[in-house]
UniProtKB/Swiss-Prot annotation:
Source organism of this protein record: Shewanella loihica (strain ATCC BAA-1088 / PV-4)
GO terms for biological process, alphabetical: cell wall organization; peptidoglycan biosynthetic process; regulation of cell shape; response to antibiotic
Family indicated by similarity: Belongs to the UppP family.
Note: Bacitracin is thought to be involved in the inhibition of peptidoglycan synthesis by sequestering undecaprenyl diphosphate, thereby reducing the pool of lipid carrier available.
Protein name: Undecaprenyl-diphosphatase
HAMAP family linked: Undec_diphosphatase
NCBIfam families, sorted: PRK00281.2-4, undec_PP_bacA
Record's function text: Catalyzes the dephosphorylation of undecaprenyl diphosphate (UPP). Confers resistance to bacitracin.
EC number: 3.6.1.27
Membrane topology (UniProt): Multi-pass membrane protein
Source superkingdom: Bacteria
Organism taxonomic ancestry: Bacteria, Pseudomonadati, Pseudomonadota, Gammaproteobacteria, Alteromonadales
Amino acid sequence: MDIFQVIVLALIQGLTEFLPISSSAHLILPAQLLGWQDQGLTFDVAVNTGSLLAVVIYFRRELFSMFTAWTSSLVTRQQTQESKLAWWIILATIPAVIFGFTAKDFISTHLRNIEVIATTTIVFGLLLWWADKLNREGFSEFQVGWKKALLIGFAQAMALIPGTSRSGATITAALALGLSREAAARFSFLMSVPVSLGAAILVVKDLLSSQEAIDYQALVLGTALSFVAAYLCIHYFLKIISRMGMTPFVIYRLALGAILCVVIFA
């Protein structure tokens, strides 16, 4: 990989990981237009690590409070709002784990193509618009409850289909279930931690068993750029949605879907 490819793909991964616009749709366009080959497991580890570090550092206080409350609840059997939130996020992670292990090969073989990505980009963009218009004041992430957490978890599992967008699917489900925009985004971002950590472990496992040469320059640069892009993305996304809602991202998804359709039929 040359430096330009590393910069472009790392920034795309960092920016699109937490915006409801689908990272796979953005990663496929440079590959299609510029003829780039697959970036390899080493680079996947780098950009996933950068994104994971960004959300952990940005929400470090919340995650620390949740972790200490959760571990305390295991001993005392008494629940606080932080420990409940931790349990709900654990519950919401289960569907993605099950679906990921059972459908991984099918998705990679049959659904990882530009036609599917174009369709899901448009369809889930329209669903995001519907959920955002349906939403009013909403409630906070501390009022989710186990039923809603599980439903949002199923949405996260569905996001394994390329083009859906993990944050897009979970935010859409959270809005439809009554969370406020900011709470939906925060819950989605917190949900990403166990999923991203698990995915990173699996990728590292695959990397250790492969014969792929490690490009340390791409590793360091990809991690750093992905971290910075993801951190800034989280910060400004939470500010934008409080004022403008999801409409800009819906319009962007529809435009991107249209571009992908042009690429398909060109």
